[in-house]
Amino acid sequence: MARDLKDCRVPCKLLLEDLQALCRRKKLVCKQLSVTKNNFNDYEVEYLCNYKKHKGREFFLVKWKGYEESENTWEPLKNLKCPILLHQFRKDMKAALLQANEPLDSASLSGPIISFLRQKATQRIRLKKWEDLMNQTCWHKGRIFVSNEVDMDGPPKNFTYINENKLGKGVDMNAVIVGCECEDCVSQPVDGCCPGLLKFRRAYNESRRVKVMPGVPIYECNSKCRCGPDCANRVVQRGIQYDLCIFKTDNGRGWGVRTLQRINKNSFVMEYLGEIITTDEAEQRGVLYDKQGVTYLFDLDYVDDVYTIDAAHYGNISHFVNHSCDPNLQVYNVFIDNLDERLPRIALFAKRGIKAGEELTFDYKMTVDPVDAESTKMDLDFSRAGIEGSPIKRVHMECKCGVRNCRKYLF
């Protein structure tokens, strides 16, 4: 039994830095955490929560990591070796003083200002822990950052970050049983590679950018293929390649997502992930979501309207991407390790070049040219595929995208 358990791993309930603080507080030596008798008294600033000036000297009330607030201490500026926390505290303090119309050179802070600074500091800690958790959970290269400079909202409740779709009750997915025999799917494709076997042409160029029209299905190489993981026909399965930031919008659209790196036109950005459920189940959930004024239901009606992706409680960063009537992302149906046309994977590609710092959006009510749809054996219902695409939506939702050609309503 001991031999079988030797290489087992279990999730840790605390972050390593929290465990380090706990060991120091309890005076426990732990070599694995680099806690020794020599650094028992190394204290780490968790956040700054008050400020005062006395005889020209600045003092900050410090909340120490791993210690209760009752053990907070006032420290002179020279004792603090946390420039990032100091910069953020001064920025928050200035904003709060301006908002309250109080002097910026105040020698002490009023109760409401102190309360705001404490709330803001603890909010940032919660958001940072959520950010760390998502980055520990995700499999992809691109990092996730979180920012909220608008209000006091913390991480969303009842949301679990996932790396692949979660199958709901009554949903079965059959694994692919055949793959291509190509050694080089670009220069020496055998029988047209995976797309050719299904009478389609390859969707990507040598730079892994999509080259087919929206509405044309994408068939990537799969786990049964002879080619390796660096094959140019493996794109969506490689996951997010760009650093992205979940941020709070300042115009009532809730959370949004912006890119921190430039994204070239036709590049893969992210996959829309969630819980795959039956249309009947989606109908029931849709009634509840309508009452809440939210929508995370994405119909998979490439050929038949049988299944829906619900990203309300399980999803990835796409959960936070907002709608726009003039979006910079385009939806494509992708097939990899499952070829059931009722269960495509939903991939979002850049419609144009996207600058660093720009918000990412897609059209919840996207359309496909009927000519293109017909030419690719696609059911014309795909013109309604997406978050809008079924009778689940029973109420009008106001659009707040703000673009010139805004349709005023999402649905």
Curated annotation (Swiss-Prot):
Residues involved in Zn(2+) 2 binding: C180, C194, C221, C225
Protein name: Histone-lysine N-methyltransferase SUV39H1-A
Family listed: Belongs to the class V-like SAM-binding methyltransferase superfamily. Histone-lysine methyltransferase family. Suvar3-9 subfamily.
Positions annotated to bind Zn(2+) 3: C185, C221, C227, C231
Binding, Zn(2+) 4: C325, C399, C401, C406
Gene coding for it: suv39h1a
Transmembrane parts of this sequence: none
CDD domains noted in UniProt: CD_SUV39H1_like
Residue ranges constituting the SET domain according to the UniProt record: 242-365
EC number(s) from the headed UniProt entry: 2.1.1.-, 2.1.1.366
Domain Chromo: 43-101
Pfam name, any one: SET
Tissues expressing this chain: Expressed ubuitiously.
Entry annotated with the keyword Secreted: no
GO molecular function: histone H3K9 methyltransferase activity; histone H3K9 monomethyltransferase activity; zinc ion binding
Domain text: Although the SET domain contains the active site of enzymatic activity, both pre-SET and post-SET domains are required for methyltransferase activity. The SET domain also participates in stable binding to heterochromatin. In the pre-SET domain, Cys residues bind 3 zinc ions that are arranged in a triangular cluster; some of these Cys residues contribute to the binding of two zinc ions within the cluster.
Positions contributing to Zn(2+) 1 binding: C180, C182, C185, C193, C194
